[in-house]
Amino acid sequence: EALDGRVPARIQLTHIHIDHAGATGRQLEHWPDCEVWVHERGAPHLIDPSRLVASATRIYGDDMQRLWGEVVPVPEERLTVLTGGETLGDWRVEYTPGHASHHVSYLHGPSRIAFVGDVGGVRIGGGPTIPPTPPPDIDLELWHESVDRVAGWGAERWAITHFGTFDDVDAQAQAMHEGLKRWGALARDTDAETYEREIVAEMRRTGDPETTEAFLQAMPPFTLYPGLERYWSKRNG
């Protein structure tokens, strides 16, 4: 309805997590000429989403169907598979792992807007920037590198999926670096209950009640600790 009858030429996915890509197959049923851009590591899981659904179900449990509905496969012939480093028309593509091993970001040349997906963090209204860290691919070192990579574009604005566009690009990049260090260290040194309590407390300290509620709905704290726990477990052997 928001498109007001306009038909998109493509869906440019930053990554295939279900809150970003779960409805892609269903959307294509309405737009038969629309193509999908996706990183090569994510493409197989759009064609056959069974592992994607299973992974998300481990996080959301009995709420999976209520939250996300049916995840419809994407026909392979509708995909444009990316590796990073491409320039496609007005768009520059970079591989930006850290949040996900199949994450890419896009720079739109004419507008100088960078579409950074979850690499730019979660920022709602005047609230803080929090790194979204669900399992299984969190890699803090790669994430820091990806933040620097998209910051190096010199974009005028970052478009962050959760939620909005922001023109304080340098400050946002710095907030992400600080957030990755702070919350990564907390997850290393504490347990899930303490981590979740601190996330909620941070939101309440720095955001108004409406912003806090929006954040808790968009990025439930129970989804954040497991990704960092897995990261530290793998790193520490």
What are the language-model segments listed below?
Residues 186-237:
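C-terminal regulatory/interaction regions
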Residues 9-19, 46-95, 101-170:
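Metallo-beta-lactamase
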Residues 169-178:
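Histidine/acidic-residue-rich catalytic or RNA/ligand-binding cores of hydrolases
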Residues 1-11:
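Pre-active-site segment of Zn-dependent metallo-hydrolases
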Residues 22-31:
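Metal-dependent catalytic neighborhoods of phosphoester/phosphodiester hydrolases
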Residues 15, 36, 56, 96, ...:
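Divalent metal-coordination and catalytic microenvironments
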